[in-house]
């Protein structure tokens, strides 16, 4: 494993972790969600599956999260997450492990980011696996209680306890919500002609199953899969859920990495 810091387009540091395969069968970039970090269990388990299949795995902390990169979580936006993904891939293109087409995986805000990348650069990507992805700002808005949204707007920020980092309170500016409204995966879903694997928890209230079914329906062809993990929430942590996700990935990678 090799961990380094690179600069993004704003001259901020991004922490990148590269796990090289000795006999590389493929390359995958794995991306966390809002307020996440590259070592979260649901990312570790996906990385394990790809490594077992001979892939070089690249993970990174976006800026404005709780990892090792620059910035503050309260300033996080989908725009900044997506730009960091582009910048990590651009940097990787100068490295000896780089190959195209590569694979992409992302969770939640990372999920919409990797699909946006595919929609913008379909020829560079062999397959994409959004886990519990945000589908659009519009659908996200429908998911909010109008009273909570009004309170967030009036106050300028909202706070909640972190699920992954005990004792950490996450404060997020209202600008994140406004920025998210600019994005929607559905109009360009026709570009998703490569294998697409969508995974979502049955009890996900942030990016619920009904949102994933809308995205799934918009994707053309027959190289698409939607897996619903029973009893699972938005962020996966239970061992049985993690193992199920790993098994799904192992089968999917085997099916399409030829």
Where are these regions (language model features)?
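N-terminal cap/lid segment of alpha/beta-hydrolase-fold proteins
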Residues: 1-23
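Conserved alpha/beta-hydrolase
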Residues: 41-70
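Short alpha-helix in the alpha/beta-hydrolase fold that links the catalytic acid
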Residues: 43, 194, 208-217
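Alpha/beta-hydrolase active-site loop
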Residues: 75-96
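Hydrolase active-site cap/lid region
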Residues: 120-170
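Short beta-strand/loop motif that positions the catalytic acidic residue
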Residues: 192-193, 198-200, 204
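Acidic catalytic loop of the alpha/beta-hydrolase fold
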Residues: 203-207, 235
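Catalytic histidine-centered segment of alpha/beta-hydrolase-like enzymes
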Residues: 232-245
């Amino acid at each position: 494993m090799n961990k380094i810091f690179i600069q993004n387009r704003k001259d901020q540091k991004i922490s990148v972790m590269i796990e090289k395969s000795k006999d590389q069968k493929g390359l995958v970039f794995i991306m966390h969600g809002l307020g996440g970090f590259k070592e979260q269990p649901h990312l570790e388990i996906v990385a394990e599956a790809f490594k077992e299949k001979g892939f070089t795995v690249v993970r990174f902390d976006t800026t404005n999260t709780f990892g090792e990169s620059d910035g503050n979580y309260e300033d996080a936006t989908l725009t900044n997450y997506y730009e960091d993904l582009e910048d990590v891939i651009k940097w990787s293109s100068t490295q000896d492990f780089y190959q195209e087409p590569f694979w992409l995986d992302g969770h939640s805000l990372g999920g919409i980011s990797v699909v946006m990348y595919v929609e913008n650069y379909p020829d560079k990507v062999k397959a994409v696996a959004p886990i519990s992805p945000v589908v659009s700002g519009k659908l996200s808005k429908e998911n909010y209680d109008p009273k909570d949204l009004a309170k967030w707007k009036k106050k300028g920020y909202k706070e909640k306890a972190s699920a992954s980092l005990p004792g950490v309170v996450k404060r997020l500016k209202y600008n994140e919500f406004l920025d998210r409204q600019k994005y929607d995966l559905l109009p360009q879903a026709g570009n998703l002609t490569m294998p697409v694997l969508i995974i979502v928890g049955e009890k996900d209230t942030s990016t619920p199953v009904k949102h994933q079914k809308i995205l799934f329906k918009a994707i053309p062809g027959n190289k698409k899969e939607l897996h619903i993990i029973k009893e699972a929430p938005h962020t996966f942590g239970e061992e049985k859920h993690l193992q199920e996700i790993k098994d799904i990935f192992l089968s999917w990678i085997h099916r399409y990495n030829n």
